[in-house]
Structure formats: C-alpha cells, structure tokens
C-alpha cells in the first residue's frame, strides 16, 4: 500500500514537470502515515485525503491540485467499472475491466463508451449470461478502423465469460486439476487415451505449470470466438470443456509424445511457440491433436483413375479425408472426355464434369460433424477436351447441371501454352481426350512433361486418328480470365516448372497440387489388382487387393511473422527448429484416414513450413510496400527462415536417418 501511495505522489509531481527527490517523497509519505487516525478505519479515501492535506501543508499547491484531479479521474474509472460489473451481475468482472483500463489508456477506449453501448443492449429479464454476452457484443460493435483494439477488449470479455462458465462446468463435475480433467475427458471418449498412457501423473502436473493464462490476451475477439466454437474440446452437447491454453498444451503433449529424455522440455517448447502465437499448426492438427481420431495432416492429393471403380474409390477416399478435416486435391487429367468411347461404344462417356459434380456433393455432405463442409480442388490439364466446360464450373450463367459451385477448379499448364500466349496468342490450341490418346498411341500424354511432353503433344496433333477440339490460345485465356473475374478460379499449376524442380524426380512425376496449390509431390493412381473370395474362420469374405500408388500427404505449419522478432537470428533459428521437429513428429503420431496416405507419408516424410502475418510484419516496422527496403528486408527474412529450416532438417536426418527415397 505504501508503494502505491509513493508512486501516485511521484506521478503527480512528474505530471507537473516538478522534480522531487526520493528523500522528500519519503518524508511526505511518513507524514501521511503519521497522520492516520487509530480510531477511524483506514480506507483508500482517507489515505488520499491525507496525501492532499500534506502536499498543501508543504506548499505543493499545483501538485496537490493535479493529485486531486488524478484522484477524481481514478474515482470515475472505478465508478464505471463498478456500474458495468453490477449491471452484468458479476463482481469478478471488475478486475478484468481494471486491467482493460490499465492496458488501453487512449480516450477512444474509454469504458464509459462501452457502458453506453452495453446499456443500449440491455433489456428487462435478461439472464447474467445474456448480459455478459451483450457486453461483449457492445465491445465488438465499437471496433472500427480508427479504434481497432476494441476487438482485443471484446476478446478479454468473451474469455472472462467463458472461463467463468468453464470453471462452473468442472466444479459441477467435481473435477479439479489438469490430470483430473484429462482423466475425465479420456473416460468420456473425448480425449485420446494415448496421452495418459504416455505421460505420468507427475508429468501432467509439471505440464500444468507451463500454462500461461495471460496469453489469452493475445487473442482478438474473432480468433477466440472461432477457437471456442471449433477447436477446443466440447462435450457431445457442444459445451466447451477445454480452455485455449489447455488446447495448446494438449497439442504440445501429443506432438512431444515420442520424444526421449527431454520430452517435457519439448512439450514446453511446443506449448510456448503455439500459445505465444509465433507458430500456427495446420487446422487438422489444432483441431484433432490430443483427440481419439487424431488426423493431423492438412493436405491430400489423389490421382483419379479412368475407371468406374477407380473414380468411386477416389470419391470414397475424399469422403474419408474430409471426415477428419483434410483438404483434397484431385487430378482428373486421366479421366476420358465427354463423347469418348466406353468399351468401344462411340460417344458413351459423359466426361469429367459429371464426376466433379459428385465430388462437389461429397464435399457438402461430409461436413466434419457439422463444423465445416469439405474442401477440394479439382485439376485438369490445359489440353483436356473438357476444358471449356471445366472453366465454367463456378460461373453463374449456363446450364446448372454442368455446375459445381463448391469445388475449386485448377488448370495444369505446360510451358508450351504460355509460350504461345506470349509469342502468338492466336495460335491454334488442340484439346484432346487422354483415353483416346492412350488407345491410339499406346501412351498416356499426361505422364510426360517438358520437351518430351511437347514432342508427344505435337505427335498427337499430327495424328488424324485422334479427334481434336481446336480453339485458339486466346479463346482459352479469355475463358480463364472471365472465370477468374467472376469466381477467383481457376488456380494455376505450371506442371513443367514444378517437375523441373522436383527433388524426387528420380522416382516419379507430379501431375497437380493440393487445395492450396502449395505442395508438389510425386503422384500415382491407386491400381486394382484382384478381388478374391476366401474363407476365414468359417466365414466367406471378399478380399480386394490394390497397389497403393502415391497418395500425397503433407503436414503444414505457419510462422506468424507479425508475432516474431525476425531480426533476432538465434530466436528465429530456435523457433524454426521447434516447428520443424513438431511437423516431423506429426508424421509418426498421425491417425491416417487411409492406409494409402500412411504409406506415402512415411515414404517421403514431407512437411511444409510456410508463413502468415507477412503484411503485419511490414506494417509493425513501418516498411512501405513499394520500396527497395521492403525487398531487401524480405530477402533477409526468408533467407534466414530457409537456412534455419534446412539446418533443422539436416539435424533431424543425422538424429533419425534420412527418408527412404532420398538421393
């Protein structure tokens, strides 16, 4: 209490530009304390009265006046806090509001404005929870471009309400510490039993000490609201049973599960990087780690074969991937075009659009327990005969039976297309059916790239036995631009450039990318081998054998550049090393929706470390977008990230061994 009085008096002198030594301040403080009455209870108001009297007795009239005004201002701040807390009916809210007043001192964030907005939302008969929700809504509605920090204030109010309800939930269940909560969630089938199987009671208690609830203040309202609705563990009646910090810790416990002697050290490193929001793991990792069905990978890519069984197998694969939160890329470049033959019957094939519509419906139907619908990108080669219809999949005009509004179309372009667009945009461009080429020429044109592809493409163009749908390059460019303006698609995938840079080109080729067009790995379709009938334990069973192909999987994380000290090389290297290790661990700890995915992921052990918050990073440093400083700064940052990632990956290879196909 004495320190508070001392600091308040010093601020009063500083505010008047008056210097005063610590000794004189201590003398004033001693006088204040000596003047206390032994019969009248000591209150904040009485102490402040004594401070005013002592300052004036010593001739510090201006300072005393400033102190009186400061005191009145503090009283006004207390009054508005108490009024809001009483109106909500939650006395514990007062401390949250006090912290808000301390951290957001600009006039535009005055709680008086919040009080006025809040009272306009209040209605007779509202429950305490409804009033708390109205208070949060008031802060959200005060958020503007001129006052953006109201979103952080709204987040604190939302977090307080959530924590109060969460504490009541656990109190009602008679559960106290973190170990007890994890045991309860495990027994209810909401938490993976592997966590408590790998960690002792003492280790969970140690992990609980890592928790930093104050890091909840890093959230914006929209971020926290999304986290509470989609990511924290909920009961089957949709009641959140996990705090954001417990979520981060649960993810860290999962990702460090197989670490050795320094396992708890890695738990803390993983927790710190996540809870400080320096690194964001992919959505499936954030959502599914620590849960019974712990599918951690974001991205999958499948090569759709040109057969009925193969197409429906790919649809089934997509449904299973989507069920557990994965996004999908599907390459349709092998599927025969509309009007092609089926078993020699002319004009029997319906083309890729019909199958893509099934993909669209699957994405909508398999919606992850109602959380969000599936997400899929469908890829087609720029020379496929169905390309014009494909480019109109999401546009609003035309036959609705040829539309698929919930998929993301993407086109795989060879270098030849862009070369013609640059040199002679009116040049003819020939669209052909891959099945017809395979039947007539004996090879699959899509299985080649670069100069070899160009040679075979021209060979097909000059073969009169192959039907062509001839347009100009300009026609295709026009369709692409029209679709891009209306829908933001198609995505572009430059297949020759990608395959030239393929580090695993010695073992295969890349046909397309994933939903986000940021991963590129060897692909091959799943092949049916046989279907046989066996007898097992007296029962008749049908066994289907398949060759797994290359079902692409990638585990992703993102460095949040706006929250990182990118100039600090040592800190950045440590952060990147931590993220790389977490991603590598995810490969072994993953629950795979398909065995095909597990085989490919463990063969290539592919990971993807990206960035977010790029513009935030520049804005915080006052770096103009259109400047040489921007380019130089960005080069330095990404060189550091790349170096740190390669260094961390090399260290992992020395520790655990290289991946099977490395050359």
Where are these regions (language model features)?
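Extended catalytic cores of very large enzyme megasubunits
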Residues: 1-663
């Amino acid at each position: 209490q004495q320190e508070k009085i001392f600091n308040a008096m010093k601020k009063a002198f500083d505010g008047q530009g008056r210097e005063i030594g610590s000794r004189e301040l201590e003398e004033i403080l001693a006088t204040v304390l000596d003047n206390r009455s032994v019969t009248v209870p000591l209150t904040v108001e009485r102490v402040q009265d004594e401070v005013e009297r002592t300052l004036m007795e010593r001739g510090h009239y201006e300072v005393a006046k400033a102190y009186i005004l400061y005191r009145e201002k503090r009283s006004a701040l207390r009054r508005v806090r108490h009024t809001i807390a009483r109106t909500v009916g939650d006395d514990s809210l007062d401390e949250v509001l006090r912290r808000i007043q301390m951290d957001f001192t600009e006039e535009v964030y005055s709680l008086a404005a919040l009080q006025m907005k809040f009272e306009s939302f209040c209605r007779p008969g509202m429950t305490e929870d409804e009033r708390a929700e109205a208070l949060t809504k008031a802060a959200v509605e005060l958020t503007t471009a001129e006052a953006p920090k109201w979103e952080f204030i709204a987040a604190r109010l939302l977090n307080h309400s959530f924590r109060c309800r969460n504490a009541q939930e656990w109190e009602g269940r008679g559960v106290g510490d973190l170990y007890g909560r994890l045991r309860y969630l495990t027994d209810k089938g909401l938490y993976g039993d592997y966590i408590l199987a790998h960690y002792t009671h003492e280790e969970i208690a140690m992990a609980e000490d890592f928790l930093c609830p104050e890091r909840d203040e890093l959230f914006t309202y929209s971020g926290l609201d999304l986290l509470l609705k989609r990511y924290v563990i909920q009961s089957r009646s949709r009641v959140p049973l996990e705090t954001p910090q417990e979520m981060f810790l649960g993810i860290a416990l999962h990702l460090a599960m197989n670490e050795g002697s320094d396992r708890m050290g890695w738990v803390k490193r993983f927790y710190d990087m996540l809870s400080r929001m320096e690194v964001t793991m992919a959505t499936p990792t954030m959502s599914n780690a620590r849960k019974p069905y712990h599918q951690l990978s974001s991205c999958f890519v499948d090569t759709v074969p040109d057969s009925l069984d193969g197409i429906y197998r790919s649809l089934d694969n997509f449904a299973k991937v989507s069920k557990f939160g994965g996004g999908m890329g599907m390459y349709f470049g092998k599927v025969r075009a509309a009007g092609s033959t089926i078993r020699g019957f002319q004009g029997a094939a319906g083309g890729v659009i019909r199958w893509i519509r099934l993909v669209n419906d699957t994405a909508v139907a398999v919606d992850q327990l109602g959380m969000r619908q599936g997400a899929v990108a469908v890829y087609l080669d720029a020379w496929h005969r169905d390309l014009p219809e494909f480019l109109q999949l999401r546009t609003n005009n035309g036959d609705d039976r040829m539309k698929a509004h919930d998929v993301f179309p993407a086109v795989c372009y060879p270098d030849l297309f862009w070369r013609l667009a640059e040199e002679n945009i009116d040049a003819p461009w020939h669209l052909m059916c891959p099945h017809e080429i395979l039947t007539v020429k004996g090879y699959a044109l899509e299985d080649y790239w670069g100069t070899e592809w160009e040679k075979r493409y021209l060979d097909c163009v000059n073969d009169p036995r192959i039907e062509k749908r001839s347009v100009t390059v300009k026609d295709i460019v026009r369709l692409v631009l029209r679709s891009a303006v209306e829908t933001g698609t198609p995505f572009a995938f430059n297949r020759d450039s990608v395959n030239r840079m393929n580090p695993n080109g010695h073992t295969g080729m890349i046909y397309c990318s994933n939903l986000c067009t940021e991963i590129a790995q060897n692909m091959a379709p799943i092949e049916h081998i046989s279907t046989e009938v066996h007898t097992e334990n007296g029962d008749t069973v049908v066994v289907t054998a398949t060759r797994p192909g290359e079902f692409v999987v990638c585990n992703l994380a993102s460095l949040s550049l706006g929250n990182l000290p990118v100039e600090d090389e040592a800190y950045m290297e440590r952060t990147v090393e931590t993220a790389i290790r977490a991603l590598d661990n995810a490969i072994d700890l993953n629950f795979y929706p398909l065995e095909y995915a597990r085989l490919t992921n463990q063969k290539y052990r592919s990971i993807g470390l990206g960035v977010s918050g790029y513009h935030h990073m520049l804005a915080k440093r006052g770096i103009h977008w259109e400047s040489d400083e921007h380019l130089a700064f960005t080069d330095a940052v990404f060189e550091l990230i790349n170096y740190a990632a390669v260094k961390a990956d090399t260290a992992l290879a020395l520790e655990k061994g290289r991946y099977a196909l490395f050359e």
